[in-house]
């Protein structure tokens, strides 16, 4: 049984199709507060695109920002994966974009494809490099470039023993 949180009218339709899934219906403002005060109570949130975009940006803020947030839209038959952040035209060509969101999105996609070993390795490598704090882009408080952070993560994937 997977706890499921829904925002909006989708819950009534879902309840008929999946009676074994525990769910709750919250207004979006309450959901935003609960994501801050009780994030452990959420496994899945189903909502409209507008509210989902707002809540996912809030969730990204809890883990360090959009540069660290992967994203997956998973349907019955297919999954679509993309980093949460946008194209960031204000930093285009400057070599300072944080690659972690894209790399973590790749790991999420690999997990969806049941490639668990490499997915876990990528996730652990990103965690280790970011936690070490030696090679960080400006959004994470460092002064490294996109290429330098990417290289550190790739090196950690290749050299890591996990």
Q: Would you name each region that the model predicts?
A:
Residues 1-8, 12-13:
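Single conserved hydrophobic/aromatic residue that forms the stacking wall/gate
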Residues 1-2, 92, 139:
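Short, flexible active-site loop motifs that bind/organize anionic cofactors or intermediates
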Residues 7, 36-40, 158:
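Alpha-helix boundary recognition
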Residues 14-18, 22-43:
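N-terminal small/polar loop signature for handling phosphorylated ligands or for N-terminal nucleophile
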Residues 21, 25, 44-45, 95-96, ...:
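Hydrophobic alpha-helical scaffolding
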Residues 33-121, 125-134:
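Glycine-rich phosphate/nucleotide-binding loop
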Residues 116, 125-162:
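Glycine-rich phosphate/pyrophosphate-binding loop and the adjoining helix
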